[in-house]
Swiss-Prot record:
Gene Ontology terms: biological process: adenine salvage; AMP salvage; purine ribonucleoside salvage
Organism annotation: Geobacter metallireducens (strain ATCC 53774 / DSM 7210 / GS-15)
Lineage: superkingdom: Bacteria
Protein name per Swiss-Prot or TrEMBL: Adenine phosphoribosyltransferase
Enzyme class: transferase
Taxonomic lineage of the native organism: Bacteria, Pseudomonadati, Thermodesulfobacteriota, Desulfuromonadia, Geobacterales
């Protein structure tokens, strides 16, 4: 995993002073690293009979679509308000500096479907806990929440359900 970890670059003071941003675009741009990441994550879920992979805006779309392709599943997008064209279900959640909202199509997940939720980085867990609630409210059965990377020191894993969390890399 070190070869994947080492290709991710740190961007100091982004998006604001005092934050060290983990920039995964370097990994995405390297074909062999991107393939390895997708293969390693997909291998974990082979045999799980995943029906849908939920990708969280925006980098989660990349990971979610690639995993869905490998697993023979459909892709569901969770987006910021006003970006999805049909009827949506919305969830507002707390941030350390206010609130934010996400939306999903109301017909994107059927009751009992097995769902894998994918995003690039697990930080505080606020966004992902909202997505988990949305999927459950639509009747989806969550197999796991998977991430390319986890910022362990922020404790986001504690906000997520039943230990159903997997991160390929931990910082």
């Amino acid at each position: 995993m070190d070869e994947l970890k080492n290709i991710i670059r740190d961007i100091p003071d982004f998006p604001k002073k005092g934050i060290v941003f983990k920039d995964i675009t370097t990994l995405l741009a390297d074909a062999k690293s991107f393939q390895r990441m997708v293969d390693l994550l997909a291998h974990r879920y082979v045999g799980e009979k995943i029906d849908k992979v939920v990708g969280v805006e925006a980098r989660g779309f990349i990971l979610g679509a690639a995993l869905a392709y490998k697993l023979g599943a459909g892709v569901v997008l969770v987006r910021k308000p006003g970006k999805l064209p049909s009827e949506t279900f919305s969830k507002t959640y707390q941030l350390e500096y206010g609130t934010d909202s996400l939306e999903i199509h109301t017909d994107a997940i059927r009751k009992g479907e097995k769902v894998l939720i994918a995003d690039d980085v697990l930080a505080t867990g606020g966004t992902m806990s909202a997505v988990v609630e949305m999927v459950r409210d639509l009747g989806g059965e969550i197999v796991e929440c998977c991430f390319l990377a986890e910022l362990d020191f922020l404790g986001g894993r504690k906000k997520l359900p039943d230990g159903k969390v997997f991160s390929l890399l931990t910082f």
